[in-house]
Amino acid sequence: MAHTLIGIIPALICAAYGICILCVGSGSGFFLVWFLLAAGILLQTFLPALAEASSAWIHLMQILLRLLWILFAAVVGITWLLIGTQFSAKGDANLDYMIVLGSQVRADGPAVITKYRLDRAMEYLEDHPETVCIVSGGQGKNEPAPEAVIMKQYLVQKGIPAEQILTEGRSLNTIENIRNSKAMILEQKGAEGDAEIEDDVGIVTNNFHVFRGVMLARHAGFRNVSGIAAYTNPFYLPNNMLRETCGILKDFLCGNLL
């Protein structure tokens, strides 16, 4: 009985958390991962009872499930350690350019997670008025306008000069954010081709996302790049961290991080 409760309680927590993420309405289907985790925990909980029937298939399934949990824990542990290396990044002083990575926007303005990025960028820009800010983000299927347009409007309303902000409104993911922003910098400098960027550049995004943003920038040819970490609501951090784990794993397997 105690063993069963130990399994059921975490499964219920995962399912309840998944419902909370669903209710936020982020436009992503990643909340389903929490239901999948809940199902995996329940399966792990009740398989031992089924194994008493001495079915070879049940025993094999039990072993495979344990191996999957070990692999899952190892991947999550390693990636979260990597994410932690940039979790409190403050960026270098006197940056030439700052790239604010796009995130969800709504009809009434940036979503909360996007505001955190913009507010962090604003803090830096107020202290470094010579830094050129690039807001990067295209228009998602659930968004009223390109993210970059609404992000710039927000910064201008907060007092950042419009001429200090460049908009890159075509990107639909982090890799495109980096590549298209790089092309914009090269165009502004009058450089041709796909030259490396020697300027000091900062990547502004939420703390869980900084590591991947910086690594993608280095891979894209930014030689002097640093991260600037913005706040994340702790309640949503488990979902954001787990989703970022998938992003890091995908980009690693695609060769975008090395």
Enumerate the predicted regions with their spans.
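Membrane-embedded alpha-helical segments of integral membrane proteins
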Residues: 1-51
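Structural motif marking the loop-to-transmembrane transition
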Residues: 1-5, 57-61, 234-238, 242-245
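Lipid-exposed faces of alpha-helical membrane segments in multi-pass integral membrane proteins
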Residues: 9-16, 39, 67-74, 78, ...
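Structural signature of transmembrane alpha-helix termini at the membrane-water interface
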Residues: 16-26, 46, 50, 74-85, ...
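Transmembrane alpha-helices and immediately adjacent membrane-cytoplasm interface residues
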Residues: 43-89
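A structural signal for short, hydrophobic/glycine-enriched beta-strand patches
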Residues: 71, 77-243, 247
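Charged, glycine-interspersed solvent-exposed loop segments at helix/strand-loop junctions
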Residues: 236, 255-258
